[in-house]
Amino acid sequence: MCDTQGIPLSLTVSPGHHSDSRYFSTVLDKVCLPPSLGRPIKRCRTVLADKGYDSKALRQYCDRFRIKPIIPLRQMHRRPKKGLPRLFDRPAYCKRNAIERLFSWLKEHRQIATRFEKLTSSFEVMIPLACIRICLRKSFSDRT
């Protein structure tokens, strides 16, 4: 998970044969946003995700913690539900490319892209190191 600038907020390494949506709540629970004053913020206000995360359970999880899910609906055969349909905020969804940029920045590191580290514990250490490098590059960039 990352913010709109592509700064990583939390991550979880999962097996390749598992769906990413299975770890949605785990990743959200690890988020700790630095505040301007006071305690750290434990929940974000909105979550941008692709169609793979469109499920009733994930939307209920977001509703429970007052998180606005911006997730496009899957194009599958659904029966119309009673009440107002969920609105989809397309302009806000356009900001979802931040996570794709983060993945491309992570894959610039050869050890992560080619998975040199065979043990999961070693691989889990390499990703935060790459994230630190990304944050430092964004913070101390000589470009404006």
Predicted regions and their residues:
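Helix-centered, glycine/charged polyanion-binding patches within enzymatic domains
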Residues: 17, 36-119
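Catalytic-loop motifs flanking and including active-site residues across diverse enzymes
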Residues: 20-23, 98, 125-128
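Generic alpha-helical structural context detector
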Residues: 26-29, 104, 127-131
